[in-house]
Amino acid sequence: MKKLMNNIVAFCAICILSFIWVGCASEGPNEKPRQVEATPNFGVIHNEIIDEIFHSLSASTTRTSKMSKDEFMADCISEAAKTVISKDPTLSRQETEKTIANISMMPLEEIRLGMSDQDRQVIDSIASMLSNNIDANIIDDYIGTCHLDEQKIQAAKAFCETYQESLNYWNKCGAEWVEYIVQNVDVNVDVDEGVIGRWLDRISWKQVAFSDAYYGWYGMMSSGCNIYVGVGGAAAGSIFSALNQL
């Protein structure tokens, strides 16, 4: 019976991958998938920037009253731009902040509407594989079969890497963010441990991570594949997604 169940699971996994591959693969039988170029992990840099934003916000003691949500996001965008420029000093502060704001405040529905049919198919397939815990190397192989230009390859990788790292980050650090937001941002709740606990129970960090992945994709597309500007926009967008859960 155990052997039968293992065979069934393996068969189902093969079926999922075969279905996903059909949409992209039009190669001949001897054509190999395009090798996806190794680049810095978008998701790791993304988490570093979110963490730096949190520590900068937490260290500030100048406010005497709660911020509005708009003021909070403006501070997050400003801190994201500052952090990005510290990593790439050649960037303009004004243009970087403007691009990060445009990325992070773009509604997800509009991001999807702006995608081509192929973009949506590729991203939907990657999302399906991520939901089914398919190995990252297999997802890279899939991206290599999709006949994408270099910018879209990097954007697709950013989607995958952002989801994986964002989910890890929010599962680990989400409680700190919720506590900070409830204490410092006007979200119409009183501060007590019970309220914070109830918010944590209702938040879906997986949903935040998937929203974040779209910001990762859009960040790379909107910044012309400047990884630091793109990841800065995705980091601010991730915080915006978490804020919208409250």
Task: Kindly give the residue locations of the regions a language model identified.
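Bacterial N-terminal signal peptides that target proteins for export
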Residues: K2-F11
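Intrinsically disordered/low-complexity terminal segments and short unstructured peptides
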Residues: L4-M5, L17, A38
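C-terminal motif of bacterial Sec signal peptides marking the signal peptidase cleavage site
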Residues: F19-G23
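N-terminal propeptides/leader regions of secreted preproproteins
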Residues: C24-D201
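Hydrophobic, gly/ala-rich membrane-insertion helices/peptides used by toxins and envelope proteins
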Residues: V187-L246
